[in-house]
A protein has these predicted regions:
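Nucleotide-sugar donor-binding/catalytic module of glycosyltransferases
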Residues: 1-185
Length: 185
């Protein structure tokens, strides 16, 4: 979890980090969340709730989000130190130009613990690279080229307006999180 949070901190004041403690009892999640919130009070917010599962944790994060964009980063995930600033800079540039996208899709690496190889999922063959596009510009996806929760950044207001609410006590809510908002993009 610390690795995850540390990977987000370089975003500085441009990023709002919401740590949702989903009723953890067998680890130090609550303590670590409070520690970071105390150390970085203008960036990190710790939210504690009874266990509601992954979907409810995402709902709580979204409910507490005040930033322009919303991205789910699970506690065992981290953002690449070289690409994270580029993503933030691109979003800032688009917003400054008055062309704020509802959704940004980013490549990601699936690094399963114990696996011999990492799996890189890239979208260059399906989406135009480094430009704003519409659904008409989307090409065919390759096998294994899924859009997952880890690859999307949504405009917060749009997510709230579309009424996205993930089921409680449910894991693998990626498809709902990714695909429910698409008609609003």
């Amino acid at each position: 979890m610390r690795n995850c949070i540390e990977s987000l901190l370089p975003g500085g004041e441009e990023v709002e980090i919401i740590i949702v403690d989903d009723g953890s009892t067998k680890d130090r999640t609550a303590e670590i969340a409070d520690e970071y919130a105390a150390k970085y009070p203008t960036i990190v917010k710790a939210v504690h709730q009874e266990n509601g599962g992954h979907g409810q944790a995402v709902n709580t994060g979204l409910k507490n989000a005040t930033g322009l964009y919303f991205k789910v980063v699970d506690s065992d995930d981290w953002l690449d130190k070289d690409n994270y600033p580029k993503v933030l800079a691109k979003l800032a540039e688009l917003v400054h130009q008055g062309n704020a996208p509802d959704m940004m899709i980013c490549n990601y690496i699936y690094d399963k613990q114990g696996a011999k190889h990492k799996k890189a999922v890239r979208y260059a063959s399906a989406f135009p690279l480094d430009e704003v596009f519409t659904w008409r510009d989307v090409k065919h996806f390759r096998l294994g080229q899924y859009i997952l929760m880890h690859s999307v950044i949504y405009r917060t207001h749009m997510l709230k307006e579309c009424g996205l609410e993930l089921p409680k006590h449910t894991f693998y809510v990626d498809n709902i999180f990714v695909y429910y908002p698409l008609p609003y993009v």
